[in-house]
């Protein structure tokens, strides 16, 4: 029997910080959730210690245990800071007496650990008439099928709006084959890779499902519930730091696509938006290149969600050509750093390292360097691999990936330094080299004003420059430049690997990373590493490996949108969304933004139709 899931019922009491020693868990709960599963019984989630939690909840509320009529687990985490490992729960309890329930909430009003459980049920704002959508131009179009595009399309389909999805890449299983072609055979498919294709960049990542965004409507819960509905492990609903992993995401993404189609939506793969058409500053149509036929066609559209992802550089350039308002924004650049996972486990878990319930340890580090730069760990992947993440010929980019089990030999994370538009290129020749003569000439004749002195595409230019240098330094065959941490700290080139074997495929070439990144970046990282070693013993170990370059930490620009309608102020009917447009960072926040934008589209199409509330 699977673990109960907290619902959105009102007048349920949520209690946090309920702690139990590990020994209190049922024996079957002490195995790792990703342990080998030979039978259907093995695959079921281990039960929570509900009786023990019921006793704790009753004690916290000051009532008899019999007064707790129901209890469900909302979150579970672990506290390994002391000798005895503790399991920490957040639970939702229903009291048998409604009047007592209300009085308890009043009594504990100032106790932050005892609060009313919020209603987390997603309700669609509208629902289209059954016969709606016969005219193609009425149907909303979603450009991009990563986490943002998937959830925009899903909620639009759930509201009866029959969206049309345009995705330049391939279905996820073909995309996986193409991606392995780069990793194993040095062969890049620019249309089907880590960045482009069904599932977006998040498919080839750790599959993290937590975020620091403000989410007062609990839309993140909607995202995770849909993931579970289509095959994600049920424990993502209560794990403190939930993740899915690449292989499991493949199945989930396929299920979400099939649901969108079942509800009347349409998903078109290997089709790329190459231009837009608009009338009176309102979107009218998209020009789409069909790679299967090598033909271009026009798709009428009045509502277009731009869920482009952070690597759709050609689309950004096209939108800029049409004067769609956008601006350069800060992002971060650096490298991937790898250590033996056992080193991180010992540093983080101490004597509990290796415990199956704890799994592979993660970390989060930050340092403010003397040169004013901030160095921090990014997208940490316990028990994972460093992957080749380029989407353009002649460029090298790194990223991190983990499977659900997180059982690979190494831990990796981005080690990155924050940069902002003041660091980006301004030379017209650089713009021409990376973006073409038209933009280069425009930059030459631009007169910067006090409001906007940074070209919106300047961060993109910097990314391309760094990725091209990394490609050359790696040997011009998609191998990546790398260096031992000890050599980097000592400011000398590496000539050979040591005890840590880098996981990046197709391979690495040992160099001095000073030649791959700006000096202010390498100086800040060199200062930070020994200090990180004081926080996590072994982090600055000589044999750890740094592989570059990490340039796509987030989008280098933001496409402007209205705070209420979520539409572009330049062209009505365009809805910039997700990470590529600068409104998310990661799977969960991108999915949440997709839901918000899907709702905005529905409200714009049917401003006077409200869905019936249960």
Model-predicted segments: where are they?
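Residues forming the flavin
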Residues: 3-72, 76-85, 93-94, 98-204, ...
């Amino acid at each position: 029997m699977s673990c109960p899931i907290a619902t959105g019922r009102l007048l349920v009491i949520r209690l946090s910080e309920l702690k139990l020693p590990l020994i209190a868990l049922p024996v079957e709960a002490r195995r790792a959730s990703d342990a080998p599963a030979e039978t259907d019984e093995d695959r079921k989630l281990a039960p929570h210690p509900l009786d023990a939690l019921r006793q704790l909840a009753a004690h916290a509320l000051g009532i008899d245990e019999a007064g707790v009529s129901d209890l469900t687990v909302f979150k579970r985490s672990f506290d390994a800071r002391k000798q005895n490992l503790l399991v920490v729960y957040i639970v939702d309890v229903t009291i048998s007496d409604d009047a007592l329930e209300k009085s308890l909430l009043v009594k504990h009003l100032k106790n932050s650990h005892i609060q009313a459980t919020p209603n987390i049920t997603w309700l669609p704002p509208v629902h289209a008439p059954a016969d709606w959508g016969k005219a193609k131009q009425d149907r909303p179009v979603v450009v991009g099928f990563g986490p943002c595009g998937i959830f925009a399309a899903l909620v639009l389909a759930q509201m009866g709006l029959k969206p049309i999805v345009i995705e330049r890449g391939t279905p996820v299983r073909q995309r996986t084959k193409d991606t392995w072609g780069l990793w194993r055979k040095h062969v890049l498919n620019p249309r089907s890779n880590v960045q482009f294709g069904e599932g977006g960049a998040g498919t080839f990542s750790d599959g993290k499902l937590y975020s620091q965004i403000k989410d007062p409507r609990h839309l993140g819960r909607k995202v995770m519930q849909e993931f579970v509905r289509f095959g994600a492990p049920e424990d993502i609903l209560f794990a403190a730091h939930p993740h899915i992993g690449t292989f499991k995401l493949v199945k989930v993404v396929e299920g979400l696509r099939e649901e969108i189609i079942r509800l009347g939506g349409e998903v078109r793969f290997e089709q790329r938006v190459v231009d837009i058409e608009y009338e009176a500053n309102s979107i009218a149509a998209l020009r789409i290149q069909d790679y299967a036929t090598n033909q271009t066609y026009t798709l009428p559209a009045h509502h277009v969600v731009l869920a482009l992802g952070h690597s759709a550089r050609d689309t950004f350039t096209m939108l800029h050509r049409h004067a769609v308002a956008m601006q350069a924004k800060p992002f971060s650049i650096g490298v991937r750093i790898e250590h033996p996972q056992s080193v991180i486990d010992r540093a983080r878990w101490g004597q509990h390292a290796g415990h199956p319930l704890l799994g592979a340890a993660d970390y989060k580090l930050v340092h403010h360097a003397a040169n004013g730069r901030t160095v921090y760990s990014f997208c940490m992947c316990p028990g994972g691999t460093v992957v080749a993440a380029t989407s353009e010929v002649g460029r090298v980019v790194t990223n991190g990936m983990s499977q659900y089990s997180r059982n690979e030999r190494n831990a990796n994370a981005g080690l990155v330094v924050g940069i902002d538009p003041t660091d980006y290129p301004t030379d017209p020749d650089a713009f021409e080299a990376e973006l073409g003569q038209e933009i280069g000439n425009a930059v030459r004749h631009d007169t910067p004003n006090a409001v906007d002195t940074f070209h919106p595409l300047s961060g993109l230019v910097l990314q391309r420059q760094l990725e091209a240098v990394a490609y050359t330094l790696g040997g011009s065959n998609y191998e990546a430049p790398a260096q031992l941490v000890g050599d980097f700290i000592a400011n000398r080139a590496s000539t050979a690997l040591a005890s840590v074997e880098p996981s990046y495929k197709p391979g690495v070439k040992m160099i001095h990373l000073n030649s791959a990144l700006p000096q202010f970046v390498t100086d800040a990282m060199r200062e930070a590493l020994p200090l990180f070693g004081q926080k996590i013993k072994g982090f600055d170990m000589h044999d750890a490996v740094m592989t570059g370059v990490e340039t796509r930490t987030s989008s280098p620009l933001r496409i402007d949108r209205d705070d209420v309608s979520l539409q572009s102020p330049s062209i009505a009917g365009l809805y910039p969304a997700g990470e590529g447009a600068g409104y998310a960072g990661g799977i969960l926040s991108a999915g949440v933004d997709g839901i918000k934008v899907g709702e905005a589209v529905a409200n714009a199409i049917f401003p006077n139709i409200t869905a019936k509330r249960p």
